[in-house]
Amino acid sequence: MGQSVVVLGAQWGDEGKGKIVDLLTEEIGAVVRFQGGHNAGHTLVINGKKTVLHLIPSGILRDDALCLIGNGVVISPAALIKEVSELEDAGVEVRSRLKISPAAPLIMPYHIALDQAREKAAGGKAIGTTGRGIGPAYEDKVARRGIRIADLHYPPQLEELLRTALDYHNFVLTKYLGVEAVDFQKTYDEALAFGDYVQPMKSDVAGILHDLRKQGKRVLFEGAQGALLDIDHGTYPYVTSSNTTVGGALAGTGVGADAIDYVLGIAKAYATRVGGGPFPTELDDAVGQGIRDRGAEYGASTGRPRRCGWMDIVALKRAVAINGISGLCITKLDVLDGMEKLKVCIAYEYRGKRTEYAPLDAQGWEECTPVYLEFPGWTENTHGITEWDKLPVAARAYLRALEELAGCPISIVSTGPDRDHTMVLQDPFA
């Protein structure tokens, strides 16, 4: 039987998953996306060349990797076409290697209009979505009024579905949110055209995955966002609209639990968050700004500056527990170079008591004050180091402490943005 590894974020997203997925896709059978949409931004740097992927799996830059998009992903037609075109213009063969589940829901123009109008209306209480229609598309999926890839190939059914959806959403857009209605004919024509475009890529993703496993092929499940943004397990309501945890890999592709052999959790050597929501270790000072500048902490999808803070072990332990993480990958270690001291949150003060467990709601998280353990920093340059013994003593001590505090071994350490700036301590596929 083949081996399957799930790669997912163990914080609030932006942990560097794309680079690690690309690293692990050598001699891979397939890479599959299982949740989210083009709100993800996976940045790859190979031989100094930067590529940002939002929807297509990061394995697309490997010539022999099959790339799959599962039923759990919501697809923007415009975003997919744009990304395919950009990659093909750069000489990457995409359409013969990209397979998309017919059960994947579409992000329609009215979803984008709803997302943006709601965020504007919310003002200071906005969640901080990317405004790309992800949430409203998932709403329609659950409400059973979503339009899926499969529907594009039955024009009469598509017309009926679209009229029903627009009757509902245009009422909300015009009467409640006070913005313009979305035009039926334009939306219908665009949907039909996309149906023709996507037809050659439409495939039974679940069936492909089952066959690959029988053939002994390696499969990598590529998560987007992070565990603490999970719709069920994250800092609700400041979360994304899908299951970013390991269960999403199963439901979002159509494989069983026995198909997963290893779960790799990606975490930065510090912590970041984009948008609203609780962030106990956030640094609103020169230290936080320094981390942001050195780490180039600006969103790959939105360009928004990321909130930066110290490593939060309480949050990380929760991510390890709810995902059954087998090993951790610590990224951006080099960003901490030159810092005199480092802090790690090992517990919270919550309503007068010390706790090592995170509250289950955003309000509870907001009331938490971090309890820190301090570590010496290092002055040496770790950028690009690929051997454990060549790391500064203090850097090794810091990593070993994270490993012990999180109760999970560190499998990979990343010391820079390039694929080669990595040390693999334990190969997840070994």
From Swiss-Prot:
<protein>
    <recommendedName>
        <fullName>Adenylosuccinate synthetase</fullName>
        <ecNumber>6.3.4.4</ecNumber>
    </recommendedName>
</protein>
<dbReference type="InterPro" id="IPR042109">
    <property type="entry name" value="Adenylosuccinate_synth_dom1"/>
</dbReference>
<keyword id="KW-0342">GTP-binding</keyword>
<dbReference type="InterPro" id="IPR033128">
    <property type="entry name" value="Adenylosuccin_syn_Lys_AS"/>
</dbReference>
<dbReference type="GO" id="GO:0005525">
    <property type="term" value="F:GTP binding"/>
</dbReference>
<feature type="binding site" description="in other chain">
    <location>
        <position position="304"/>
    </location>
    <ligand>
        <name>IMP</name>
    </ligand>
</feature>
<keyword id="KW-0460">Magnesium</keyword>
<dbReference type="GO" id="GO:0046040">
    <property type="term" value="P:IMP metabolic process"/>
</dbReference>
<feature type="binding site">
    <location>
        <position position="306"/>
    </location>
    <ligand>
        <name>GTP</name>
    </ligand>
</feature>
<dbReference type="InterPro" id="IPR001114">
    <property type="entry name" value="Adenylosuccinate_synthetase"/>
</dbReference>
<feature type="binding site" description="in other chain">
    <location>
        <position position="225"/>
    </location>
    <ligand>
        <name>IMP</name>
    </ligand>
</feature>
<comment type="similarity">
    <text>Belongs to the adenylosuccinate synthetase family.</text>
</comment>
<dbReference type="InterPro" id="IPR042110">
    <property type="entry name" value="Adenylosuccinate_synth_dom2"/>
</dbReference>
<feature type="binding site">
    <location>
        <position position="14"/>
    </location>
    <ligand>
        <name>Mg(2+)</name>
    </ligand>
</feature>
<feature type="binding site">
    <location>
        <begin position="332"/>
        <end position="334"/>
    </location>
    <ligand>
        <name>GTP</name>
    </ligand>
</feature>
<keyword id="KW-0479">Metal-binding</keyword>
<feature type="active site" description="Proton donor">
    <location>
        <position position="42"/>
    </location>
</feature>
<feature type="binding site">
    <location>
        <begin position="300"/>
        <end position="306"/>
    </location>
    <ligand>
        <name>substrate</name>
    </ligand>
</feature>
<feature type="binding site">
    <location>
        <begin position="414"/>
        <end position="416"/>
    </location>
    <ligand>
        <name>GTP</name>
    </ligand>
</feature>
<dbReference type="GO" id="GO:0004019">
    <property type="term" value="F:adenylosuccinate synthase activity"/>
</dbReference>
<comment type="pathway">
    <text>Purine metabolism; AMP biosynthesis via de novo pathway; AMP from IMP: step 1/2.</text>
</comment>
<feature type="binding site">
    <location>
        <position position="41"/>
    </location>
    <ligand>
        <name>Mg(2+)</name>
    </ligand>
</feature>
<feature type="binding site" description="in other chain">
    <location>
        <begin position="14"/>
        <end position="17"/>
    </location>
    <ligand>
        <name>IMP</name>
    </ligand>
</feature>
<feature type="binding site">
    <location>
        <begin position="41"/>
        <end position="43"/>
    </location>
    <ligand>
        <name>GTP</name>
    </ligand>
</feature>
<feature type="binding site" description="in other chain">
    <location>
        <begin position="39"/>
        <end position="42"/>
    </location>
    <ligand>
        <name>IMP</name>
    </ligand>
</feature>
<keyword id="KW-0436">Ligase</keyword>
<feature type="binding site">
    <location>
        <position position="144"/>
    </location>
    <ligand>
        <name>IMP</name>
    </ligand>
</feature>
<feature type="binding site">
    <location>
        <begin position="13"/>
        <end position="19"/>
    </location>
    <ligand>
        <name>GTP</name>
    </ligand>
</feature>
<keyword id="KW-0658">Purine biosynthesis</keyword>
<dbReference type="GO" id="GO:0005737">
    <property type="term" value="C:cytoplasm"/>
</dbReference>
<dbReference type="InterPro" id="IPR042111">
    <property type="entry name" value="Adenylosuccinate_synth_dom3"/>
</dbReference>
<feature type="binding site" description="in other chain">
    <location>
        <position position="130"/>
    </location>
    <ligand>
        <name>IMP</name>
    </ligand>
</feature>
<dbReference type="GO" id="GO:0044208">
    <property type="term" value="P:'de novo' AMP biosynthetic process"/>
</dbReference>
<dbReference type="Pfam" id="PF00709">
    <property type="entry name" value="Adenylsucc_synt"/>
</dbReference>
<keyword id="KW-0963">Cytoplasm</keyword>
<dbReference type="InterPro" id="IPR018220">
    <property type="entry name" value="Adenylosuccin_syn_GTP-bd"/>
</dbReference>
<dbReference type="GO" id="GO:0000287">
    <property type="term" value="F:magnesium ion binding"/>
</dbReference>
<dbReference type="InterPro" id="IPR027417">
    <property type="entry name" value="P-loop_NTPase"/>
</dbReference>
<keyword id="KW-0547">Nucleotide-binding</keyword>
<comment type="subunit">
    <text>Homodimer.</text>
</comment>
<feature type="active site" description="Proton acceptor">
    <location>
        <position position="14"/>
    </location>
</feature>
<feature type="binding site" description="in other chain">
    <location>
        <position position="240"/>
    </location>
    <ligand>
        <name>IMP</name>
    </ligand>
</feature>
